[in-house]
């Protein structure tokens, strides 16, 4: 099995044992929904709530997986991220989900089977597009285009556009939806 899938499977087992909902986001999901490309790590988001004790969540994860930062609790409080290393030395970036949009992302996640008998949870193509549109880095924009080309008519455009509209408003970035719309126009013009 691919080392990133091995790391994702290891996290899947642990999170499932602890009844923590999760979804793989980032490059691993982009490979599934878009084109194959190189990625060195695994990105995921896990279910948390404002009432969750961040220290407790961080301690649970860092008791099993090695932290890549010296003070993981403080790092998680500041960035809502936990930087871990799986048993096979693959880096895993764990985002602590916020209520609202990420509740939808986790509820909509789908099973992906990289190897018979081993299913991991991936965010949907729509949610990956939303994540990558908000991030807006050059690789993200390339991923959006490849997902649009590959998934095309399967995409729930209403869902994507509504969440991007909300993020544009919250982030005060009215140009945000255009990152997706540009990719969509290129697809239909091809």
PLM regions and their residue ranges:
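Compositionally biased terminal segments of proteins
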Residues: 1-190
């Amino acid at each position: 099995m691919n080392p990133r899938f091995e790391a994702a499977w290891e996290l899947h087992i642990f999170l499932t044992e602890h009844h923590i909902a999760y979804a793989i986001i980032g490059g691993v999901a982009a490979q599934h929904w878009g084109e194959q490309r190189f990625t060195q790590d695994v990105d995921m988001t896990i279910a948390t709530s404002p009432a969750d004790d961040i220290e407790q969540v961080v301690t649970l994860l860092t008791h099993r997986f090695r932290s890549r930062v010296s003070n993981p609790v403080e790092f998680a409080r500041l960035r809502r991220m936990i930087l871990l290393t799986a048993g096979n030395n693959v880096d895993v970036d764990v985002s602590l989900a916020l209520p609202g949009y990420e509740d939808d992302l986790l509820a909509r996640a789908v099973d992906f089977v990289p190897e018979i008998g081993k299913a991991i949870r991936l965010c949907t193509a729509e949610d990956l597009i939303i994540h990558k549109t908000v991030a807006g880095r050059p690789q993200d924009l390339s991923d959006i285009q490849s997902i649009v080309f590959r998934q095309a008519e399967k995409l729930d455009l209403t869902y994507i556009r509504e969440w991007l509209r909300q993020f544009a408003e919250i982030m005060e970035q009215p140009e945000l939806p255009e990152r997706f719309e540009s990719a969509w126009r290129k697809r239909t013009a091809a």
